[in-house]
């Protein structure tokens, strides 16, 4: 019986226990047995096992893996490819690096089984530019496996060939998107393609292609070896199996952990990772990486599976859990996220190229205390436009942390907009680092606040519909009130 406070190692079972360069040590611990089994099965039988297991993608939206297999296997073009997406560009994420650096043969085996299932004889591993130091380990492991007959030509004397090649990106985050990744492998600029046609019909080099994340491919061998029923006994009904979580941020114990799907987020933070570092309080958590939803401290008692996280407005995606303590300003965190996204946009589509920049500008105005309530309405309209019209997932997901943070931390945004008091950064009372005297700040017709008051009327009128916030911004709690009580000195 699994203890919910302990890890369950299915994918990480060989971490620290084998030499990652040795295919024989991998084989001695049960490696390549699933591939041997697959080589004696036909394509449909392999796909049926993956279908019955309920395996879903571990890198993005949780698309059923068997459907990618099925679409690619049934494509009319006989030349097909398997592509492993190892472009782990999400800030703070390390799960794929751990798998590739400690157990690369598990990924190779999953790719070879997928190749047998769809009729592909060539696979590519696309490694992010920052992981090129892993090339020696990967190449040594692959060469050793080919020398011993586990992989390559005539694998295990089955008559089936499967060759694995390596390619590296140049550091562009957008190349994690599947069609931009294809463009990069082909030597072109890494920009997303218009779809349809989809990769299972027109993928790498214009051929049917099955592309999956490192973690997804690593799941294939254990499923085929132990059976679909075994796999479904782990996790939840709609999200079977285990998941790798990268926990980072303000916790005592950080790292990559493996738990069954459906583990409780609160348990991970407090029971596994030792709680918030330095005795501080919890402000919020961002799940699924920089493009994931940001929830507040009252929402963390939730199960982590694909559907539950999606229902909260985000995605489980890469499984990154960023823990944010109360010494951080949520508006500033969102602004940093947007700074990352606007720099990583490939610029091909207008919604992402211009929308990302405009979102950054609007949130920057809020963080500096220069915004008004209509700016929140502009953000809402802009994020919805990006979600509906952007060419690829980068533009779609840019909106997620903004929308969810405004929904779950509205009080903090209003505090900045009112230029009242942010308990962390005090930006609500400071514009571009300049402290203004209280009487000028509120009454001078030439000051920013004076001009805004003249345009919109008394400040309280702006918040008649926000009763809770009206209580929050009482004179005693405001920066202005504390300024006056201190005789005009800085708070």
Q: PLM features: residue spans?
A:
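Histidine-anchored nucleotide/phosphate-binding helix
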Residues: 103-117
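Conserved phosphate/anionic-ligand binding catalytic regions in large, soluble enzymes, centered on
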Residues: 52-71, 169-183, 187-188, 342-355, ...
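Short amphipathic, charge-patterned alpha-helical segments
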Residues: 110-114, 261-277
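Ferredoxin-type iron-sulfur electron-transfer modules in oxidoreductases and energy-metabolism complexes
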Residues: 33-49, 78-79, 86, 95-100, ...
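Cofactor-/ligand-binding subdomain signature composed of acidic, glycine-rich
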Residues: 1-49
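Short acidic, glycine/serine/threonine-rich loops at helix termini
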Residues: 61-62, 66-69, 93-96, 135-140, ...
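Hydrophobic alpha-helical positions that pack around
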Residues: 135-261, 273
């Amino acid at each position: 019986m699994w203890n919910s406070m302990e890890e369950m190692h299915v994918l990480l079972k060989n971490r620290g226990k084998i030499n990652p360069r040795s295919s024989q040590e991998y084989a001695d611990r049960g490696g390549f047995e699933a591939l041997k089994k697959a080589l004696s099965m036909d394509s449909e039988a392999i796909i049926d096992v993956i279908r019955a297991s309920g395996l879903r993608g571990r890198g993005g939206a949780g698309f059923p893996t068997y459907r990618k297999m099925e679409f690619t296997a049934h494509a009319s073009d006989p030349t097909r490819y398997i592509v492993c997406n190892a472009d782990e560009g999400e800030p703070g994420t390390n799960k794929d690096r751990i798998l590739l650096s400690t157990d690369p043969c598990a990924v190779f085996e999953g790719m070879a089984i997928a190749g047998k299932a769809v009729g592909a004889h060539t696979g590519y591993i696309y490694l992010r530019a920052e992981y090129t130091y892993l090339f020696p380990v990967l190449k040594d492991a692959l060469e050793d496996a080919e020398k011993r007959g586990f992989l390559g030509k005539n694998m295990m004397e089955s008559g089936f060939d499967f060759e694995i090649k390596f390619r590296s990106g140049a550091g562009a985050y957008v190349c994690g998107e599947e069609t931009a990744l294809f463009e990069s492998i082909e030597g072109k600029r890494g920009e997303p393609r218009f779809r349809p046609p989809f990769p299972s019909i027109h993928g790498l080099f214009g051929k049917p292609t099955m592309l999956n994340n490192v973690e997804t491919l690593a799941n294939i061998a254990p499923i085929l070896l132990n059976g679909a029923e075994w796999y479904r006994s782990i996790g939840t009904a709609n999200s079977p199996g285990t998941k790798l979580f990268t926990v980072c941020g303000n916790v005592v114990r950080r790292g990559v952990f493996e738990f069954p799907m459906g583990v409780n987020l609160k348990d991970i933070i407090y029971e596994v990772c030792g709680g918030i570092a330095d005795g501080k309080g919890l402000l919020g958590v961002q799940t699924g990486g920089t493009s994931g939803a940001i929830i507040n401290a009252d929402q963390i008692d939730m199960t982590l599976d694909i559907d539950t996280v999606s229902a909260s407005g985000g995605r489980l995606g890469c499984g990154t859990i960023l823990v944010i303590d109360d010494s951080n300003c949520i508006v500033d965190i969102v602004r940093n996220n947007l700074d990352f996204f606007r720099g990583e946009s490939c610029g091909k589509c207008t919604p992402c190229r211009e929308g990302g920049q405009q979102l950054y500008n609007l949130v920057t105005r809020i963080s500096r205390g220069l915004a008004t309530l209509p700016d929140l309405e502009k953000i809402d309209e802009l994020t919805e436009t990006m979600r509906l019209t952007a060419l690829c997932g980068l533009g779609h997901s840019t909106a997620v942390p903004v929308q969810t943070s405004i929904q779950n931390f509205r009080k903090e945004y209003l505090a900045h907009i009112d230029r009242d008091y942010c308990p962390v950064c005090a930006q609500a009372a400071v514009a571009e680092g300049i402290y203004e005297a209280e009487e000028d700040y509120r009454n001078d017709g030439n000051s920013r606040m004076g001009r805004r008051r003249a345009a919109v009327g008394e400040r309280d009128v702006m918040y008649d519909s926000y009763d809770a916030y009206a209580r929050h911004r009482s004179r005693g709690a405001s920066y202005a009130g504390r300024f006056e009580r201190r005789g005009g000195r800085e708070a």
